[in-house]
């Protein structure tokens, strides 16, 4: 099976509606002050913190190049804008504030999520920072956001801890889903089949070049829940080939040692999602009714100010580590070669995590896995 090349001019599944947000041509710098804080960087985009000169409000400015690999990719950026507009009423999707356009770039002014990526909560060194009760709340909010997208026939296709932000870190804030550069519209007559996404988060159907459905996002939610609860990435191998083999064979460690501090209901939830056949995965809507998500301690969830002094000490530890861990991107950098989440110092990170988003096509690495 030959690899389908990424081509901005021929990708299916893009929203073609004209964005409702005005594309301003005024000088962005006349209205916003860029701070030194860079939130993310990719091959074709950079995200930086900015401050409105008129209100003093903080935002995330995402600078997207319109030409990539010599191709005009403006339609891809307009698709991302259209998805953000479609989800504007969803509290768990990052909010689009304004759009500016220059001769070479389109600038998205996005809501600023001060809590950073939930990836930081997946680090083994911060295992004591978040309880299973906290994870329940975060997963529920992710499901609510994804359910909203799926109701509108949008699949995200790159859900991962680096693309889910928090409104604040202490108290633990609300979920904001970002990075819609790989999202696609489904449900039309033509099937959507593409090799896309971050390697260790790819679903089996993407590796097999099978039709993409909303179930692909559900696989990723299973991975996110696994990482938040075990602080380990379930499928990453010692090399690229092993990673794809683990995914294809659904090699997941559910050992007592790995899940010693995880409830049986949480384990059941993950196991229901990490199944090879996408038709057997529950939908986002049905997941919201799972027994695990009903096990809430409402006191600790809605009264974070009453948490113990030790929790505040843990928060200080997290704040200190944030300087060494990946910063939030507040949106897609629009290409599978982006490395916006590679940390400057990986000494804190478990060897079970990888950050290379630019791996070759899985079909080039392990052709014997696919029929």
UniProtKB/Swiss-Prot annotation:
Checking InterPro entries in the record gives: Kinase-like_dom_sf, Prot_kinase_dom, Protein_kinase_ATP_BS, Ser/Thr_kinase_AS, ST17B_STKc
GO process terms (BP) = apoptotic process; intracellular signal transduction; positive regulation of apoptotic process; positive regulation of fibroblast apoptotic process; programmed cell death; protein autophosphorylation; protein phosphorylation
Enzyme class, one word? Answer: transferase
Q: Does the keyword Cell cycle apply?
A: no
Binding locations of ATP: 39-47, 62
One function term, GO molecular function aspect:
protein kinase activity
Q: Where expressed (tissues)?
A: Highly expressed in thymus, spleen, and testis, lower levels present in the brain.
Family per UniProt? Belongs to the protein kinase superfamily. CAMK Ser/Thr protein kinase family. DAP kinase subfamily.
| The protein, known as | Serine/threonine-protein kinase 17B
Source organism: Rattus norvegicus (Rat)
**Lineage start:** Eukaryota, Metazoa, Chordata, Craniata, Vertebrata
**Gene name linked to the record:** Stk17b
């Amino acid at each position: 099976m030959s690899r389908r090349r990424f081509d901005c001019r021929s990708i299916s599944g893009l929203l073609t509606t004209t964005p409702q947000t005005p594309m301003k041509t005024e000088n962005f710098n006349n209205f916003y002050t860029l701070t030194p804080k860079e939130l993310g960087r990719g091959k074709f985009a950079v995200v930086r913190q900015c401050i409105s000169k008129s209100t003093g409000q903080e935002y995330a400015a995402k600078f997207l190049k319109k030409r990539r690999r010599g191709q005009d990719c403006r339609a891809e950026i307009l698709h991302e804008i259209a998805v953000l507009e479609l989800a504007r009423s969803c509290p768990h999707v990052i909010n689009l504030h304004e759009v500016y356009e220059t001769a070479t770039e389109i600038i998205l002014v996005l809501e600023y999520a001060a809590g950073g990526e939930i990836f930081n909560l997946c680090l083994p060194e911060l295992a004591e920072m978040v309880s299973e009760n906290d994870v329940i709340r975060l997963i529920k909010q992710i499901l609510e956001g994804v359910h909203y997208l799926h109701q509108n026939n949008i699949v995200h296709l790159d859900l991962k801890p680096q693309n889910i932000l928090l409104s604040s870190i202490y108290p633990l804030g609300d979920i904001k889903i970002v990075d819609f550069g790989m999202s696609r519209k489904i449900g039309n007559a033509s099937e959507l089949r593409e090799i896309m996404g971050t390697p260790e988060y790819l679903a089996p159907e993407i590796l097999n070049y099978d039709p993409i459905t909303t179930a692909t996002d559900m696989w990723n939610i299973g991975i996110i829940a696994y990482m938040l609860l075990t602080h380990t990435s379930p499928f990453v191998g010692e090399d690229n080939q092993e990673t794809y083999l683990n995914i294809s064979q659904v090699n997941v460690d559910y050992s007592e040692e790995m899940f010693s501090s995880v409830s049986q209901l949480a384990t059941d939830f993950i196991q229901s999602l990490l199944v090879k056949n996408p038709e057997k995965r529950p939908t986002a809507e049905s997941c919201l009714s799972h027994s695990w998500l009903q096990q809430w301690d409402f006191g600790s969830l809605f009264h974070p100010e009453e948490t113990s002094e030790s929790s505040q000490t843990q928060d200080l530890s997290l704040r200190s580590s944030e300087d060494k861990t990946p910063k939030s991107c507040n949106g897609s950098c629009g290409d599978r070669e982006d490395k916006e989440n590679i940390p400057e110092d990986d000494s804190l990170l478990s060897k079970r995590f990888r950050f290379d988003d630019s791996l070759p096509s899985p079909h080039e690495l392990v052709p014997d896995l696919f029929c």
